[in-house]
UniProtKB/Swiss-Prot annotation:
This is Mannitol-1-phosphate 5-dehydrogenase. GO terms for biological process: mannitol catabolic process. It is an enzyme of class 1 (oxidoreductase). PANTHER family: ALTRONATE OXIDOREDUCTASE-RELATED, MANNITOL-1-PHOSPHATE 5-DEHYDROGENASE. The gene is mtlD. Its EC number is 1.1.1.17.
Length: 378
């Protein structure tokens, strides 16, 4: 049986990446620091996924195990030494924390003389995630390890898309996911092109697909949350049931479409259909997706290269409309949740400093005209 190492045994890891790896015949070693999840994986050796749609069918994922990377790093290194593929779903901010362990695993392959080519795919909500991870891993590799990695270890970027809401069940491994999923891998950085996963798309140039996903799904989802929160909605479905909010989300997606078409020459009709499907996904009555989950960490989401500021910058450069995105940015700056550290910090910054200074600090912008435009909406 083929072997995989997956960093991140959370809902997305189990409910999306784990399902695909299982369907492709892999044994999966989930690596995490959550002892409860790791213990359950080792005790049961399987878990169930429920598809959030009419009929609510279930998939049993078997041949799984767990490794606590904090308590047993040597087991992770041993697994990496022998594995056929490595994936992650831990969040962009956590990638640097697994780099040293990954480097040790690569060094172990080198010392063992394992020259079987291996690909490492960071399945995160970020542009260039795998290459970012590689830059972090390189900091811990010896000169010999660097040469070995360049020859035998690939870090192809990936774009992933599936809504997996925050949830809690008596069975800690059980996870509910939406029916839709998309996983796209760039081919130009693959070291093992012969290992093709079914239900995964492969593209020579991944950037258009990553931007289509991030600027459509992530921007649209966050827009639903921030506008929804402003109007008192508790879930994304509740937000979409308000015609005013839905209309605003559609207006944001129309601006995103104009950017994607101008930049990547996407077919207008196909992109309209893609965005229509996104709205339908947000309206899935079988998913309870809390506004608080989607809106959390607003400081990160208002970053220079993130889901709002980047498309706004690029639309401005192309002299295209971004008014609706600006309005959403205003709602994001106004968002407060006592349980979200970043939203509280944002409120404190706005209370202590000039709004303009906070906008510059949070967004990283130096375009004075754009800064002033954002200030008008806060």
């Amino acid at each position: 049986m083929k072997h995989s190492v997956h960093f991140g045994a959370g809902n997305i890891g189990r409910g999306f990446i784990g399902e695909i790896l299982f369907k492709n015949g892999f044994h999966i070693d989930f690596v995490d620091v959550n002892n409860q999840i790791i213990h359950a994986l080792n005790e049961k050796g399987k878990y169930e996924i429920e598809i959030a749609q009419k009929g609510q069918s279930r998939i049993e994922v078997t041949n799984v195990a767990g490794i606590n990377s904090k308590e047993h790093p040597e087991q992770v290194i041993e697994a990496i030494q022998k594995t056929d593929i490595i994936t992650t779903a831990i969040g962009p901010n956590i990638l640097p924390f697994i780099a040293e362990l990954l480097a040790k695993g690569i060094e172990a392959r080198r010392v063992a003389g394992n020259t079987q080519v291996l690909d490492v795919m960071a399945c995160e909500n970020m542009i260039g995630g795998s290459q970012f991870l590689y830059q972090e891993v390189k900091k811990y590799l010896s000169p010999e390890g660097l040469t070995f990695a360049d020859n035998y270890i690939g870090f192809p970027n990936a774009a992933v898309d599936r809504i997996v809401p925050a949830q809690s069940h008596e069975d800690s491994l059980f996870v509910v996911v939406e029916p839709f999923n998309e996983w796209v891998v760039e081919t130009k950085r693959l070291k093992n092109p012969d290992l093709r996963l079914k239900d995964v798309h492969y593209e020579e140039d991944l950037e258009p697909f990553i931007e289509r996903k991030l600027f459509s799904v992530n921007s649209g989802h966050a827009t639903s949350a921030y506008i929804g929160a402003h109007y008192g909605a508790k879930t994304i479905l509740e937000a979409l049931q308000n015609p005013n909010i839905k209309s605003r989300i559609e207006s944001v997606l129309a601006e995103i479409r104009s950017l994607l078409i101008a930049k990547w020459n996407f077919d207008k009709k196909e992109l309209e259909n893609y965005h229509k499907v996104i709205i339908e996904r947000f309206e899935n009555p079988f998913i309870v997706d809390e506004v608080s989950r989607v809106a959390r960490t607003p400081i990160r989401k208002l970053g220079y290269n993130e889901r709002f500021i980047r498309p706004i910058r690029e639309l401005k450069e192309l002299s295209l409309s971004y008014k609706n995105l600006l309005k959403t940015v205003g709602y994001a700056f106004d968002y407060r949740d006592v349980n979200d550290e970043e939203s509280i910090r944002l409120g404190e910054l706005l209370a202590k400093q000039l709004v303009k200074d906070v906008v510059i600090q949070v967004t990283g912008l130096d375009d004075q005209e754009l800064i002033e435009q954002i200030v008008e909406y806060i």
